[in-house]
Amino acid sequence: MMKKNQTMISEFLLLGLPIQPEQQNLFYALFLAVYLTTLLGNLLVIVLIRLDSHLHMPMYLCLSNLSFSDLCFSSVTMPKLLQNMQSQNPSIPFADCLAQMYFHLFYGVLESFLLVVMAYHCYVAICFPLHYTTIMSPKCCLGLLTLSWLLTTAHATLHTLLMARLSFCAENVIPHFFCDTSTLLKLACSNTQVNGWVMFFMGGLILVIPFLLLIMSCARIVSTILRVPSTGGIQKAFSTCGPHLSVVSLFYGTIIGLYLCPLTNHNTVKDTVMAVMYTGVTHMLNPFIYSLRNRDMRGNPGQSLQHKENFFVFKIVIVGILPLLNLVGVVKLIMKYHSKSVA
């Protein structure tokens, strides 16, 4: 039993990334570019789907939700990482740490559910094309999305409440760049058995079951595609669901590499690199995968935006000018710190 006079900690120290001091500014510029690209790319996908009437379909409603989730998921960890990379005291208050853990769980699990919903869309579109509009009605799509948000809220709230009841009284150094659930459990000085069981049980429901559903839907999709006699039908099917399969592989590939590899192969550097891939890089690549490999995203938005001159100008500014301004700012930042180090 914990002693009453034992001091309770009020903040944690985030060790951050295992980067050499001379490489700090280079990686800061790299992560800043990744974060800005993630924000602009996913925001552009959301705006394009909203403005183009040809994309007002269940599949693209799910895609806009996925882009919003990617945008928010990166914003949970990347700004704090960038701040701590330029700070001499990379601390985070206990309440802020719980909030970061909550939103990290929320948007991570939400993406898993959204990928399952989108896989179901692809499955119906390819395996039952004549009944697609009947099965995937707007009401059905909205119901699946609402269920995903509700289940995600319950999952993140449960873990956060269980974490809030724990006591942290000794070690307050987190060997990570964000407040990860498993890392916080190792620092607790009270009984974490309930948290461990809930994490094991909920992890199976939240990750394993959606992953199995994705595997089964992909297997049915591939078998249906292989039975299509015409080359045009195969190309259309891959154009519809090829980007989604790429995103699924990227998302679950990083999770498997981070959490499901043999424990003997785990080390801090490897786990940190995989966590950066999981929290930053995958969400940056998602809008590019959907835009470059999906014919609807490449074709119809351009035709629609030509009739919206104001937004067309806005698009040119976002895509063309802002990256140049960001690049100039990054170069100036590197030169400033380089001159200080030389002096």
Curated annotation (Swiss-Prot):
Membrane topology: Multi-pass membrane protein
Segment forming the signal sequence: none
Transmembrane segments: 29-49, 108-128, 142-162, 196-216, 243-263, 272-292, 311-331
Keywords linked to the UniProt accession: Cell membrane, Disulfide bond, G-protein coupled receptor, Glycoprotein, Membrane, Olfaction, Receptor, Sensory transduction, Transducer, Transmembrane, Transmembrane helix
Segments in the Extracellular topological domain: 1-28, 129-141, 217-242, 293-310
Cytoplasmic side: 50-107, 163-195, 264-271, 332-343
GO biological process: adenylate cyclase-activating G protein-coupled receptor signaling pathway; signal transduction
Matches recorded under SUPFAM superfamilies: Family A G protein-coupled receptor-like
Disulfide bonds: 97-179
Localization per Swiss-Prot or TrEMBL: Cell membrane
Function: Odorant receptor.
Family recorded in the similarity comment: Belongs to the G-protein coupled receptor 1 family.
Name of the molecule in the record: Olfactory receptor 1E3
